[in-house]
Amino acid sequence: MYLNEQLDHWASNTPDSQAIVFEGKAISFAQLAGKVACARGFLSEHCGIRAGDRVAYLGLNHPDMLVILFACESLGAIFNPLNSRLAREEYAFLLANAEPKLCFAEPSFADILHDIGNGDVEILSTGNLYDKPAGRDRSATSVPSSQPLLLVYTSGTTGRPKGVLLSRFAVQVNIENCQDLFQF
């Protein structure tokens, strides 16, 4: 089972169980599934995100980052989390290289992206995810396991950072390996 299939399973079978606890606040599986559905509708209907499009995220670890990841997976889009500890020039390089259609930024990082001035990338606050309810319930797209899901960058120790695409299958195998290693 892939990310959204697992979320759907747990939201159906244990809707009130805790999926995420962040800063002392619990989010149930049903609430997380609702947020993902809302974000999926926002991304597809209001932002025009389709399979293969890249969606970047700049911010600290936050539940919204996971919501965007799950929404991207359900649309066949590619999630591109950006390291929150980089310099402006490094962000400029990564955005030019990754060519995201859209970049979500936490408010504390939005000015950095606006200063870079890459007019090809729409920059939105993570708060926008839930601003406009979807006109209809946009269900998940059927996405093959070979579809790229995650675009991450190497540290660039021997030069510029290099983009690495991970498929849905690769992400799932990593999750399963972590479950085995950490016994959860």
Positions of PLM-derived features:
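AMP-dependent adenylate-forming
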Residues: 5-28
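Conserved AMP-binding/adenylate-forming
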Residues: 25, 40-86
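Structural core segment of the AMP-binding/adenylate-forming
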Residues: 45, 74-141
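Structural detector for helix-capping/boundary residues
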Residues: 30, 53, 89, 101, ...
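Conserved AMP-binding A3 loop
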Residues: 28-30, 149-176
